[in-house]
């Protein structure tokens, strides 16, 4: 049974968004650069090219951890819902298709295409918050809105780490403690993205298979089996990064580690875009293998 380190972010306030793996890796790299210098970032990149992995962040509530619904369940819904009458099967299938997350127990069932249930609710909400900006010349005010994520009590986000313990202790753990005070995802001066961090062991009972569900958004090197596309851009030290096409968490791949992109943005150092898969074995319905 695969064993991972769960990096649990206990929020001190709202987050701008739930960070994906490329955002987490970029933040970790920036933290390591601030702590140890740019040469340590190159060592971190080498460790991940050599096999270390992080997942995207997902919500938790207390001791309940949520994971992305594998896309492999959607073509298998007819078999999963066997035994239900037509109306109930239609209603349940509609809810299953809309579901984004499953708790750990039902995620493990979904990996094996066994009947599973979806959570009644998730432990956060997206909220539009009004802000006021003043014109520097006229002092006229205007209102704008920005979206933030607010968590329920005893809830937050976590991500998984897989790889050598020395890489975690030397890079990931100190970087996350640093980021807890400086913030992740922007607007830390407003109190967003600040957190306390805890580390826990987490096991996931996944089947042995040459097919995998990725728990990170990834830049595939082969054609995925089942996928949902995700376009992401962003900024790095004031320079705009090009929009890149990822496959989203929950996509299904076959023996594909993904890739890491190096960008030249006219800075004193290269910028790395994390696109490695975080694979867990998954069973596929007949006809897709």
Curated annotation (Swiss-Prot):
Q: Which InterPro entries match?
A: Csm4 (IPR005510)
Domain of life, per the record?
Archaea
A molecular function (GO) held by this record is: RNA binding
Statement: the UniProt record of this protein carries the keyword GTP-binding? no
Per UniProt, which keywords does this protein have? Answer: Antiviral defense, RNA-binding
| Keyword NAD listed | no
What GO biological process terms does the UniProt entry carry, in alphabetical order? defense response to virus
Q: What quaternary arrangement does the UniProt entry report?
A: Probably part of the Csm effector complex, that includes Cas10, Csm2, Csm3, Csm4, Csm5 and mature crRNA. Interacts with Cas10 (csm1).
Which protein family is named in the record?
A: Belongs to the CRISPR-associated Csm4 family.
Further remark: Encoded in a type III-A CRISPR locus.
Describe the function of this protein.
CRISPR (clustered regularly interspaced short palindromic repeat) is an adaptive immune system that provides protection against mobile genetic elements (viruses, transposable elements and conjugative plasmids). CRISPR clusters contain spacers, sequences complementary to antecedent mobile elements, and target invading nucleic acids. CRISPR clusters are transcribed and processed into CRISPR RNA (crRNA). The subunit probably binds to the 5' handle of the crRNA, helping in discrimination between self- and non-self.
Query: Can you say what this protein is called?
Result: CRISPR system Cms protein Csm4
Q: Which gene encodes it?
A: csm4
């Amino acid at each position: 049974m695969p064993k991972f380190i769960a990096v649990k972010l206990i929020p001190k306030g709202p987050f701008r968004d739930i960070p994906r793996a490329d955002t987490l890796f970029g933040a970790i790299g920036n933290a390591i650069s601030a702590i140890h210098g740019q040469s340590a970032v190159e060592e971190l990149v080498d460790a991940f090219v050599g096999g270390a992995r992080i997942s995207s962040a997902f919500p938790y509530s207390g001791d309940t951890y949520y994971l992305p619904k594998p896309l492999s369940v959607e073509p298998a819904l007819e078999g999963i819902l066997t035994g239900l009458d037509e109306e109930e099967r239609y209603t349940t299938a509609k809810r299953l298709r809309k579901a984004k997350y499953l708790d750990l127990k039902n995620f493990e069932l979904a990996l094996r295409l066994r009947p599973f249930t979806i959570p009644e609710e998730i432990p956060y909400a997206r909220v539009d918050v009004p802000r006021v900006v003043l014109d520097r010349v006229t002092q006229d005010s205007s209102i704008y809105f920005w979206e933030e994520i607010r968590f329920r009590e005893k809830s937050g986000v976590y991500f998984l780490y897989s790889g050598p313990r020395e890489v975690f202790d030397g890079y990931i753990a100190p970087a996350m403690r640093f980021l807890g005070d400086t913030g992740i995802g922007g607007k830390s001066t407003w109190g967003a993205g600040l957190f306390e961090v805890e580390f826990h062991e987490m096991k996931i009972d996944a089947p042995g298979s040459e097919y995998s569900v990725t728990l990170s958004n990834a830049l595939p090197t082969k054609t995925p089996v089942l996928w949902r596309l995700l376009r992401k851009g962003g900024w790095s030290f004031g320079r705009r990064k090009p929009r890149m096409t990822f496959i989203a968490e929950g996509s299904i791949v076959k023996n594909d580690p993904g890739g890491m992109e190096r960008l030249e943005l006219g800075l004193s150092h290269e910028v790395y875009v994390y696109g490695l898969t975080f694979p867990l074995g998954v069973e596929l319905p007949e006809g897709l293998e």
